[in-house]
Amino acid sequence: MKTKTDFLKMKQEGEPIVMLTAYDYPAAKLAEQAGVDMILVGDSLGMVVLGLDSTVSVTVADMIHHTKAVKRGAKDTFVVTDMPFMSYHCSLESALKNAAAIVQESGADALKLEGGDGVFETITALTRGGIPVVSHLGLTPQSVGVLGGYKVQGKDEESAGKLIEDSRRCEEAGAMALVLECVPAALAERISKELTIPVIGIGAGAGTDGQVLVYHDVVGHGVSRTPKFVKQYAQIDQPLEQALRGYVEDVRSRVFPEDAHSFRIDQQVLEGLYGGK
């Protein structure tokens, strides 16, 4: 399994880091088989697999549950888990308690924290406590209400300057890596070159040290529409639906199950049970 040191070396040698967001055992297993370097168990699971309207309702228990499944499917891949909404904002003490619970119960290799202001102290405390932290700046879904929706961040001088400063402070606080989401490509590239830690982009252009996308977006599963920054490599929903329709039709027409799918019992045993009736 790659470690923090390996990811730093990959950045230094210009080798792109491949990260994928996955939420369960089958997806994690496929991700590892495909050669993904790092798996993110994102709180986006609330919308993608739980059918919620946002990430706000996702709990620490949800993150532990899904991370356990991912770790079982990808035993040799570095797994990062999101700390969900308000699990690290109320106090430093509660943040440390929640972080410890996630790591101890799920086996996560690192935790991801969104935002800059108000989070730097927590990054430092977790790092000192032995928990690696991945920071997340730009479009931060947990704060989408404050940001005014799902919009590109850092397009003007003031917000771009703030992103640069927050990126520096995340590194100084001890973050092992930084995720930049929905940030202009040129800005993300400049930040990537300035920082010594790996910068992983999602909707942040090709100049970052790595890329992350959501499994369901990549394979075309259960998504009605995809963001501009997504490249879809398959459309698996259609063959899945066709398979299910075939099953429904076969059951209703009594084509399934056939003899090949059934188990046999000696006729004498059956007659003994029912008296030859």
From Swiss-Prot:
Please list the residues that bind 3-methyl-2-oxobutanoate.
43-44, 82, 112
- The lineage's top-level taxon is Bacteria
Tell me which family the UniProt entry assigns to this protein: Belongs to the PanB family.
Organism field? Bacillus licheniformis (strain ATCC 14580 / DSM 13 / JCM 2505 / CCUG 7422 / NBRC 12200 / NCIMB 9375 / NCTC 10341 / NRRL NRS-1264 / Gibson 46)
Q: What is its main location?
A: cytoplasm
- Full protein name: 3-methyl-2-oxobutanoate hydroxymethyltransferase
In the record, biological process GO terms are:
pantothenate biosynthetic process
One term of GO molecular function: 3-methyl-2-oxobutanoate hydroxymethyltransferase activity
Note on how the cofactor is bound: Binds 1 Mg(2+) ion per subunit.
